């Protein structure tokens, strides 16, 4: 292992044991969704010495990303998120290998975007249907994947947990994903069985913005075509200390999986 690599990332071996850094250097992780959670996850993976990253997202940076997304800075607004994060990754590690896909994951492009086997997929996108299809696609192919639930509307990082997707609580989106996977993709209906998909979520109740400007735990009444979600201009509020904590919890689990001894 070259001297530069050891100087930059030697602390990883001193934490996980000799040889861990060499294994991470050989790993390939795909991050889907480079937003409030995904951008911080990419940062943590790059700083942990992961040698190859694939970044998938079609979004550009906007001013209202500033409260939660790592690359949202003056001079970067309007730039593709994957390009901004790629530049940052190369500054962290000039030898990192990057694959950039300026696309959103859809049921129709999973084979094209995820067809190359990787060591792990980290799902940080916020599209319900894409998450369902991606999890099902990965499980059919025995491709390890970590799913990230909703960080919006939450403020207490001590409530964040990592459990199998079949066991998550207090996350409406993950609950609906679980129902869809059982109903349409033949995931175990027996509640004693696990899905084999680690998920990051929070036990904290969601804080909803109200029409009068207050915030409380009561979901506001919406029109039939409206949906309350985390977005650039309205919907659920969010803060960096929570989106970042979700990301770091996901990367903590990723490190565990990537460094798990290989089965003979």
Per-segment meaning from a language model:
Residues 31-33, 56:
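Conserved N-terminal Rossmann-fold NAD(P)-binding element of oxidoreductases
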Residues 50-93:
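Glycine-rich phosphate-binding loop and adjoining beta1-alpha1-beta2 segment
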Residues 102-110:
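Conserved SAM/SAH-binding loop
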């Amino acid at each position: 292992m070259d001297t530069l690599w050891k100087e930059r990332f030697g602390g990883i071996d001193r934490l996980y044991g000799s040889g861990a850094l060499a294994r991470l250097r050989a790993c390939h992780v795909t991050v889907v969704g480079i937003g409030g959670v995904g951008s911080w996850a990419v940062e943590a993976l790059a700083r942990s010495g992961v040698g190859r990253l694939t970044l998938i997202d079609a979004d550009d940076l906007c001013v209202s990303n500033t409260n939660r997304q790592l690359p949202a800075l003056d001079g970067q607004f309007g730039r593709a998120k994957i390009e901004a994060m790629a530049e940052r990754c190369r500054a962290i590690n000039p030898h990192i290998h990057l694959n950039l896909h300026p696309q959103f994951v859809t049921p129709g492009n999973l084979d094209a975007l995820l067809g190359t086997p990787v060591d792990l997929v980290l799902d940080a996108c916020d599209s319900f249907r894409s998450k369902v299809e991606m999890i099902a696609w990965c499980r059919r192919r025995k491709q390890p994947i970590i799913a990230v639930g909703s960080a919006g509307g939450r403020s207490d990082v001590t409530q964040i947990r990592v459990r199998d997707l079949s066991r998550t609580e207090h996350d409406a989106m993950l609950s609906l994903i679980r129902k869809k996977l059982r109903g349409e993709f033949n995931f175990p209906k027996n509640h004693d069985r696990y899905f084999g998909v680690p998920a990051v979520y929070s036990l904290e109740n969601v804080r909803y913005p109200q029409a009068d400007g207050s915030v409380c735990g009561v979901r506001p009444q919406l029109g039939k075509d409206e949906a309350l979600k985390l977005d650039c201009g309205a919907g659920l509020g969010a803060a960096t200390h929570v989106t970042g904590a979700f990301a770091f919890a996901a990367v903590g689990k990723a490190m565990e999986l990537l460094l798990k001894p290989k089965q003979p």
